[in-house]
């Protein structure tokens, strides 16, 4: 597998391509007495390249019969092409060893006998050469005594160029990449889809050859070869693969897992499994093929592979658009393969599945087949058990029910495929799910005939309502029959599959939502679902009532049995699903548009659904969803998408779909209530939607469906409600347990995945919901703008409050229509929420999901009660969750504790007072009405606030409005109109997280919580410190003391400065105060706790208001999670209070999250901090995310800093990176980012980022989406021109079906760091080449104007080289401020972990001052803003390397007070100045850098050069021209290689060349250390990505990886600077020598000169002119760069001035608050 790090190491190097030819002459082999070789083969190999000689006989010798030889009478030549690399300043190529292996070939098997390595670099040269070699090989077998090989090795240089040139890449190396993520069909060229859509597609699918085509489409195919086997083939060789029925079930689980980790590989594996598994279905496939009907769909089962779409040859696909896709999907994929393939399919299904449905299995096949395959496997297995016959039987397209019944196997698999492929389809089915779901069989029947056209539509990404119904129709009748089968299969190892099948069967038999959920579930473990689906299809003939009843009965059984299985299976699957969901998201997106249409039609149909049928479908859905909660979350998106069709499609790529679902679910609930109040039609539609959504979400699956049905039916289906309630109770309890378990996994997955919001099953669903929410937000905002926003905000802001109070009102209304149902719904939702809650800690994306799941969280509370159906169970579940929470996040737990106790108390009271179901339902209803009211009001904040106050959660509600504003401001900037909702949702997620954590973890009693809260609030008011201490104490109780301490320490270190401020804030105004407390307390949960508790207690109004703000801040934090950056934003925010609060709260929240994670890994806290900062910065990247003022500032500050508020700092998590990418590409045509692989394949996303920051570099609107190579080339060339290390080549995106995830992530990490100005700058290298000191980036936040260079330098020196991290001078100035600053810088710097670690490392070497710089280096640019980099010499003296100073004083690097230029610019400026000085003969040493003189010190030139010529403190600037050269390293870059302090003196006497050599040596040592660690990290990271085993560890490694990459790039930049120095120095030296000689010549009289002398003089003059021109060119470049840098400085100064004023206002306000 190609090494990302090796590519990074090649940046800036030279490459030479050689052709080596080995000519074998003789092989001598001596063996033991008991053995002699048969045939010998000489293999020349490296990695995955093998060049073998022909097999030759071994002839024993006459003298020694055991010593034989192989002699080539005619020399045999083998040739290889090798690319060798070298540093530009070194002639020797880097080592590259190829191995000669002697192998014995016997009976077709080969055994290695001996090997020897040959370093080709030793035989490479510019001149062709032949070298005779006699190599002595090392025996690798006990049978070999001695081996020698004689050959001639010749090497010829083919071409030379830069290591990053396209033609220098090794194709073999490229192709050795193993894609580690599943691709979304949406992201692939549409030509594939068109092929699949072709009328003959179904037939083609039937043909075996097409599988090859698919394979060509996807490199992964090779891995999936077995899976690709046609159905017949699969049947033929079932033994070779896993057993059809049992294996499939077991297989799917692993595939899912693999899928999560590396979508493609697992998919491939699954495919292999599929073939064997398919054997059972194969018989039916033949029928299917002959019949060409839905039943035929099963035939494709053998060929579930995407590549093997041909397998899907199941003509059955043609039978109906829906069925066909399913068929190809189902039959082709075995259970196992479907699991993995599903993931792929999920991603790709959206586009390809839809398009290829009818005949698309070639493309869709891969993804669909995977998803469908698993299901189909399950279905097939079941079919084999009993429904097989029906599956085999052909069904009429017209009677989809009969089709489903007769060919349920085929169709159910088909449906599953569709489900996986199309969340929209799932939605349709869900609507239709009950079969009576309102899409009557008639609609389906009608659709069935139309299936082919529909499939075509699907291909286009549009799904007709009819289509959905046809898919949905299949399985109503046989659930009972097949339940037995399913159960039987489960023991066979299909437990997972069973759970999934359960969900799927309900999905098929029930409604689109169910199927959607089941589809997702199916992707995780669709086998069972498929099985069930078949049975339900089989009974499709039965009356709806019968079917409904049977479905309920069977499902309840399944739910009971499966629910138990599912919890674990789902959990395991969840992780797997985590990966699948990404794909599903895309699918969902594509299918969403279709689903929207389908949903609309389905909504009508659903309205028409019979109560019983609805009930049945709902109960089925509920059970299925309960089992599949993790997976179900995704289907939820489908229904949601109904409303926002456009959004669904647009946001399909992202997790927006999920958001929409959540939003829709909430909206539906709200609307349902509102409709109940005011709009019956809307209520029905939304009820249906929520029905689908909830069902899919698995939150209130049965209850929601029921209530939805009731709503659709005019709230007139109490019967169904009752039934649903019962079924729900059964499934819900088990499901809850499952969910409780799942949350952990989800949390880990989400956290690890980060970008992998999708990876978390339920959380994933939630992330999708979040995405949908955004989409829906737009759609829904249009219809219910206020409602959604307010509601979401309410949910997000005051989840606890809303949970406690709103749930009642919500439930009350719902109770009328869906009393029993809602209870169940809430329970399910609660489960999902639990997962979600766990997830939010982990990933911003998850947080979004949580936000979307805020409603779910509320439901969770109700659910806690309702699921408490056995109250004990619910409480236990809560306790478990609480434990998990506490483990995952101490801080969060504490925070949650306070509200939780309240919530618990409320919930318990409600539960105890009323039947759990009723109470919960009432709560939910109450919530809904309240939310609705708020949303309808538009400003609903007052209402919410009032209600919240009533419930003691007023504060939270109040906060909600604030949050809305803030969120809308922040997110509005970032994501546009969608952002507010997203933020709200994020907030919701965050609050939810905290609340749920509180509920589960603390399980504190309301009284205790209130007391704690009151104490906390009082403490905060009393004293910031006291408050902080108390908060910490509170946190400690909530969390283990060590953890709390660790959190505190980490955050304290990171946020110490801010914490001081925050303390004041906390003490002063609780809004800011609590924020600060949260933020700084390491969010010791107490602050958050206070926040929540404050809201709960309602505390005094002031605290309440503060609480809301706090909450808002916390929410904002949650929103951006990333908002960690909001610290900077705080500074940048126009409204200092809110913004600062937000900023602090965000940091606090991050701390909490970090703490949560920290329980698992204390590092997590730091990570959270980094993530926060990063996310914040990322969000900031949206540009002015903060209030308008801040928005203005940000643009001013730096175009490259989208979120310049709090400079993004370095990327800390894959999720934050993914979100940043989504944010900056938002609104670009054809760009839909859902992952780090296929979303980037066509190059449009890269081009969009380039265009976003550098519109002049590329004409985005002229790009052709189908011209993959050219698009990528333009983007890569553009970034390379800007200085971004080129890790990717167009070939990477073209040759690999799924681009390498790690390479793409690494490249994007570099792009983000560059575009946001957060690149690390090398500040100083330790003499021994030990750890170097780095600083975050461009110093974009340059020194505030208020800090003049002199003042700053002086202060830094005084404080041990402390550098003000932020413009907050007051804090920095504080005596204790320095350490705080350093730690805070570290926090800001993006990788809190990294920063802290670095600080720790360098603190010692650099001394306290070093600590400051260290922090600075790792800190956000805020500190760098000063632009001064203080290097601390061994002496410990502080040197402000940064501003060197006057142009004359070459020694000091150009002052970059504003740090706007990158360190590279500094170097350039230095060189330029030096050049000028030299030109002017001004080599005089300008020591000018007395430490104090820094401010004015540098000579006039210094002042001129930089606004703040912070001359490096005198330690640095030893006079002497030499110093000029050392300064060559721009201050930001690195100071002299040796410790600047001590060596400064030496440097003045050193020659520039000596200085450069010493620095280069130190750089090499530093690089060696980084390279060693990077190799380990990459190896571990790839292993974890492929296995998906430990998401938490993966995320930790990703953060470390990003840090290493940033350090490596800093070293590369510094090396480039040194190279320029060397060139300039060389020019100077030559100029000096030429000038001296020329002067000597000119001293001779003209008449005395000989002809030779005259000629020599002419040559000297020409050379001199040439040198001058070259130097001028260098100077021109430097001038250009410097001018740009100065312009940036001016712009930054204005922004910093505003920020400074803001900060001062904030500080004064905090002081007042503290006093008060």
UniProtKB/Swiss-Prot annotation:
Residues 187-196 have a biased composition (Acidic residues). Keywords: Coiled coil, Endosome, Phosphoprotein. The CAAX motif is a signal for prenylation and required for endosomal colocalization with Rab8 and Rab10. The bivalent Mical/EHBP Rab binding (bMERB) domain, mediates binding to Rab8, Rab10, Rab10, Rab13 and Rab15 (in their GTP-bound forms). The modification Phosphothreonine is found at residues 278, 448. Residues 1399-1549 are annotated as: Interaction with BIN1 and AMPH. Its main location: other. This is EH domain-binding protein 1-like protein 1. Residues 338-350 have a biased composition (Polar residues). One of its GO terms (biological process) is mitochondrion localization. May act as Rab effector protein and play a role in vesicle trafficking. Involved in apical-directed transport in polarized epithelial cells; the functions seems to implicate Rab8, BIN1 and possibly DNM1. Residues 1491-1509 have a biased composition (Low complexity). Residues 174-560, 598-617, 1173-1210, 1382-1543 are annotated as: Disordered. Residues 1005-1033, 1558-1707 form a coiled coil. A motif (CAAX motif) lies at residues 1713-1716. Residues 1542-1694 form the bMERB domain. InterPro entries: bMERB_dom (IPR022735), CH_dom (IPR001715), CH_dom_sf (IPR036872), F-actin_Monoox_Mical (IPR050540), NT-C2 (IPR019448). Residues 1516-1533 have a biased composition (Pro residues). The gene is Ehbp1l1. Prenylated. Farnelysation (predominant) and geranylgeranylation has been observed in vitro. The keyword Coiled coil applies. Interacts with RAB8A, RAB8B, RAB10, RAB13 and RAB15 (in their GTP-bound forms); at least in case of RAB8A can bind 2 molecules of RAB8A simultaneously. Interacts with BIN1 and AMPH. Interacts with DNM1. Residues 1211-1316 form the Calponin-homology (CH) domain. Residues 351-380, 394-403, 413-432, 479-490, 542-560 have a biased composition (Basic and acidic residues). It comes from the Eukaryota. The modification Phosphoserine is found at residues 170, 173, 191, 310, 367, 424, 1074, 1135, 1342, 1444, 1460. Residues 8-157 form the C2 NT-type domain. GO terms for cellular component: recycling endosome.
């Amino acid at each position: 597998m190609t090494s990302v790090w090796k590519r990074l190491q090649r940046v800036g190097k030279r490459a030479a391509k050689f052709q080596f030819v080995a000519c074998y002459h003789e092989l001598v082999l001596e063996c033991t007495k008991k053995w002699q070789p048969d045939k010998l083969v000489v293999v020349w190999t490296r990695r995955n390249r093998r060049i073998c000689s022909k097999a030759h006989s071994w002839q024993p010798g006459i003298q020694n019969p055991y010593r034989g030889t192989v002699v080539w009478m005619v020399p045999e030549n083998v040739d290889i092409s090798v690319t060798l690399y070298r540093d530009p300043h070194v002639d020797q190529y880097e080592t590259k060893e190829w191995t000669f292996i002697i192998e014995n070939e016997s009976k077709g098997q080969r055994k290695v006998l001996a090997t020897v390595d040959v370093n080709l670099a030793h035989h490479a040269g510019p001149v062709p050469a032949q070298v005779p070699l006699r190599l002595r090989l090392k025996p690798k077998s006990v049978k070999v005594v001695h081996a020698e090989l004689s050959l001639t090795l010749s090497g010829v240089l083919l071409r030379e160029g830069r290591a990053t040139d396209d033609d220098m890449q090794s194709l073999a190396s490229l192709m050795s990449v193993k894609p580690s993520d599943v691709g979304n069909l949406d992201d692939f060229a549409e030509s594939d889809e068109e092929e699949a859509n072709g009328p003959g597609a179904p037939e083609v699918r039937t043909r075996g050859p097409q599988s090859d085509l698919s394979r060509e489409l996807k490199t992964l195919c090779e891995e999936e070869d077995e899976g690709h086997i046609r159905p017949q083939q699969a049947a033929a060789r079932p033994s070779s693969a896993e057993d059809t029925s049992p294996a499939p079930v077991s297989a799917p689980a692993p595939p899912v897992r693999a899928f999560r980790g590396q979508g493609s590989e697992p998919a491939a594996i699954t495919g292999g499994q599929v073939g064997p598994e398919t054997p059972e279905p194969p018989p039916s496939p033949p029928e299917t093929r002959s019949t060409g009907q839905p039943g035929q769909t099963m035939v494709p089962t053998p060929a579930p592979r995407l590549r093997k779409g041909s397998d899907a040859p199941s003509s059955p696909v043609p039978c109906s658009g829906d069925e066909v896709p399913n068929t190809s999907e189902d039959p082709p994929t075995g259970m196992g393969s479907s699991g993995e393939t599903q993931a792929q399919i999920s991603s790709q299904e959206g586009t390809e599945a839809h398009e290829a449905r009818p005949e698309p299995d070639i493309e869709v096949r891969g993804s669909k087949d995977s998803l469908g395959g698993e299901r189909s496997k399950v279905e097939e297995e079941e079919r084999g058990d009993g429904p097989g016959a029906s599956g085999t039987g052909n069904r009429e397209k017209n009677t989809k029910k009969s089709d489903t019944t007769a060919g349920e196997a085929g169709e159910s698999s088909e449906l599953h495929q569709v489900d996986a492929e199309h969340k929209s389809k799932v939605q349709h089915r869900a609507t239709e799910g009950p079969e009576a779901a309102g899409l009557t069989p008639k609609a389906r029947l009608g659709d069935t005939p139309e299936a082919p056209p529909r499939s075509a539509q699907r291909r286009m990404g549009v799904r007709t309502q009819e289509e959905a119904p046809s898919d949905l129709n299949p399985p109503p009748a046989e659930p009972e029959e097949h339940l037995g089968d399913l159960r039987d299969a489960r023991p066979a190892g299909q437990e997972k599959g069973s759970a999934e099948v359960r969900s799927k069967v309900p999905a098929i038999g029930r409604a689109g939502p169910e199927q959607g959920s089941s589809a997702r579930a199916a992707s995780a473990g669709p086998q069972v679902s498929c099985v069930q689906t078949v049975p339900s299809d089989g009974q499709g003939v039965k009356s709806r009532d019968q079917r409904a009843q049977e479905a309920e009965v069977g499902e309840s059984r399944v739910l009971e049995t499966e629910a138990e299985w599912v919890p674990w299976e789902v959990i395991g699957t969840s992780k797997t699903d985590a990966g699948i969901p990404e794909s599903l998201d895309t699918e969902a997106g594509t299918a969403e548009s279709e689903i929207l249409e389908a949903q609309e039609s389905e909504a009508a149909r659903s309205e028409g659904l019979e109560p019983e049928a609805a009930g049945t479908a709902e109960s089925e859905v509920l059970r299925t969803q309960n089992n599949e909660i993790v997976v179900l979350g995704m289907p939820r998106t489908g229904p949601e998408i109904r409303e926002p069709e456009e959004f669904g499609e647009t946001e399909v790529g992202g997790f927006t779909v999920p958001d929409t679902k959540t939003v829709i679910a909430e909206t539906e609930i709200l609307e349902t209530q509102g409709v109940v109040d005011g709009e019956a039609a809307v209520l029905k539609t939304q009820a249906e939607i929520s029905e689908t959504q909830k069902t899919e979400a698995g939150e209130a699956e049965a209850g929601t469906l029921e209530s939805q049905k009731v709503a659709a039916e005019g709230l007139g289906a109490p019967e169904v409600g009752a039934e649903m309630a019962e079924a729900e109770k059964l499934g819900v309890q088990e499901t809850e347990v499952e969910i409780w378990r799942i949350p952990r996994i989800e949390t880990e997955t989400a956290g690890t995945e980060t970008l992998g919001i999708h990876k978390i099953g339920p959380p994933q669903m939630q992330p999708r919901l979040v995405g949908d929410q955004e989409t829906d937000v737009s759609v829904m905002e249009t219809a219910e703008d206020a409602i959604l926003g307010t509601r979401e905000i309410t949910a997000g802001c005051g989840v606890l409050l809303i949970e406690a109070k709103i749930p009642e009102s919500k439930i009350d209304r719902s109770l009328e229509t869906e009393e029993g149902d809602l209870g169940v719904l809430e329970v399910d939702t609660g489960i999902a929420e639990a997962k979600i809650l766990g997830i939010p800690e982990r990933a911003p994306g998850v947080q979004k999901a949580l936000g979307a799941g805020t409603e779910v969280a509320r439901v969770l509370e109700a659910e806690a009660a309702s699921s408490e159906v056995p109250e004990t169970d619910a409480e236990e579940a809560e306790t478990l969750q609480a434990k998990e929470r506490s483990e995952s996040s101490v801080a969060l737990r504490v925070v949650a504790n306070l509200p939780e106790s309240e919530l618990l108390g409320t919930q318990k009271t409600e539960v105890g007072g009323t039947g759990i179901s009723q109470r919960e339902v009432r709560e939910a209803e109450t919530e809904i009405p309240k939310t609705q009211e708020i949303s309808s009001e538009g400003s609903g904040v007052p209402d919410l606030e009032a209600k919240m106050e009533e419930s003691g959660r007023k504060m939270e509600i109040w906060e909600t409005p604030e949050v809305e504003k803030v969120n809308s401001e922040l997110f509005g900037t970032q994501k546009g109109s969608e952002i507010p909702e997203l933020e709200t949702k994020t907030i919701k997620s965050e609050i939810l997280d905290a609340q749920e954590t509180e509920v589960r973890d603390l399980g504190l009693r309301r009284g205790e919580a209130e007391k704690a809260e009151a104490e906390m609030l009082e403490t905060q008011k009393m004293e910031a410190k006291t408050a902080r201490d108390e908060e910490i104490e509170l946190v400690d109780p909530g969390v283990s003391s060590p953890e709390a301490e660790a959190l505190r320490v980490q955050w304290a270190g990171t946020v110490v400065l801010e914490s001081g401020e925050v303390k004041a804030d906390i003490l002063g105004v609780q809004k800011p105060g609590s924020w600060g407390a949260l933020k700084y307390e390491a969010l010791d949960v107490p602050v958050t706790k206070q926040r929540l508790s404050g809201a709960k207690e309602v505390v005094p109004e002031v605290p309440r208001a503060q609480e809301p703000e706090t909450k808002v801040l916390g929410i904002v934090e949650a929103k951006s999670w990333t908002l960690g950056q909001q610290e900077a934003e705080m500074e940048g925010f126009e409204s200092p209070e809110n913004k600062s609060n937000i900023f602090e709260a965000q940091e606090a929240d991050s701390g909490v999250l970090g703490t949560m994670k920290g329980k698992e890994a204390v590092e997590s806290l730091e990570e959270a901090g980094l993530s926060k900062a990063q996310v914040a910065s990322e969000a900031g990247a949206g540009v002015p995310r903060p209030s308008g003022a801040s928005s203005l500032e940000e643009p001013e500050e730096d175009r490259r800093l989208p979120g310049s508020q709090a400079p993004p700092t370095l990327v800390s998590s894959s999720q934050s990176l993914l979100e940043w990418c989504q944010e900056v590409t938002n609104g670009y045509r054809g760009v839909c980012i859902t992952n780090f692989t296929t979303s980037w394949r066509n190059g449009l996303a890269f081009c969009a980022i380039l265009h976003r920051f550098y519109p002049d570099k590329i004409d985005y609107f002229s790009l052709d989406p189908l011209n993959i190579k050219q698009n990528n080339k333009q983007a890569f060339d553009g970034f390379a021109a800007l200085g971004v290390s080129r890790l990717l080549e167009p070939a990477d995106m073209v040759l690999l079906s799924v681009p390498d995830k790690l390479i793409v992530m690494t490249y994007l990490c570099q792009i983000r760091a560059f575009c946001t100005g957060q690149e690390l700058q090398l500040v100083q290298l330790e003499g021994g080449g030990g750890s170097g000191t780095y600083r975050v980036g461009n110093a974009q936040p340059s020194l505030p104007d208020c800090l003049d260079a002199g003042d700053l330098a002086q202060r830094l020196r005084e404080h041990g080289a402390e550098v003000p991290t932020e413009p907050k001078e007051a804090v920095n100035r504080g005596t204790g401020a320095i350490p705080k600053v350093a730690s805070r810088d570290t926090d800001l710097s993006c990788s809190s972990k990294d920063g802290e670690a670095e600080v720790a490392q360098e603190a010692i070497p650099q001394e306290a001052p070093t600590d400051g710089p260290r922090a600075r280096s790792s800190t956000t640019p805020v500190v760098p803003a000063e632009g001064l980099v203080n290097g601390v010499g061994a002496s410990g003296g502080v040197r402000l390397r940064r501003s060197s100073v006057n142009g004359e004083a070459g020694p000091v690097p150009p002052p970059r007070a504003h740090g706007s230029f990158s360190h590279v610019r500094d170097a350039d400026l230095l060189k330029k100045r030096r050049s000028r000085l030299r030109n002017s003969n001004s080599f005089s040493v300008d020591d000018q850098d007395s430490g104090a003189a820094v401010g004015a010190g540098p000579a006039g030139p210094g002042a001129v050069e930089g606004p703040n010529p912070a001359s490096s403190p005198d330690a640095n600037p030893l006079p002497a021209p030499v110093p000029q050269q050392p300064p060559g390293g721009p201050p930001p870059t690195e100071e002299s290689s040796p410790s600047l302090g001590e060596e400064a003196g030496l440097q003045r006497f050193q020659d520039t060349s000596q200085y450069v050599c010493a620095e280069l040596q130190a750089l090499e040592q530093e690089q060696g250390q980084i390279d060693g660690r990077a190799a380990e990290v990459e190896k571990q990271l790839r292993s974890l990505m492929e296995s998906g085993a430990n998401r938490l560890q993966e995320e930790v490694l990703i953060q470390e990886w990003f840090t290493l990459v940033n350090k490596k790039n800093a070293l590369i930049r510094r090396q480039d600077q040194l190279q320029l120095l060397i060139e300039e120095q060389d020019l100077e030296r030559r100029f000096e020598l030429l000038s001296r000689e020329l002067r000597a010549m000119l001293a001779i009289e003209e008449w005395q000169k000989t002809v030779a002398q005259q000629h020599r003089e002419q040559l000297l003059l020409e050379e001199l002119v040439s040198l001058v021109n070259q130097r001028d060119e260098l100077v021109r470049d430097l001038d250009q760069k410097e001018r740009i840098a100065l312009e940036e400085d001016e712009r930054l100064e204005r922004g910093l001035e505003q920020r400074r004023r803001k900060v001062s206002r904030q500080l004064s306000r905090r002081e007042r608050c503290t006093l008060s």
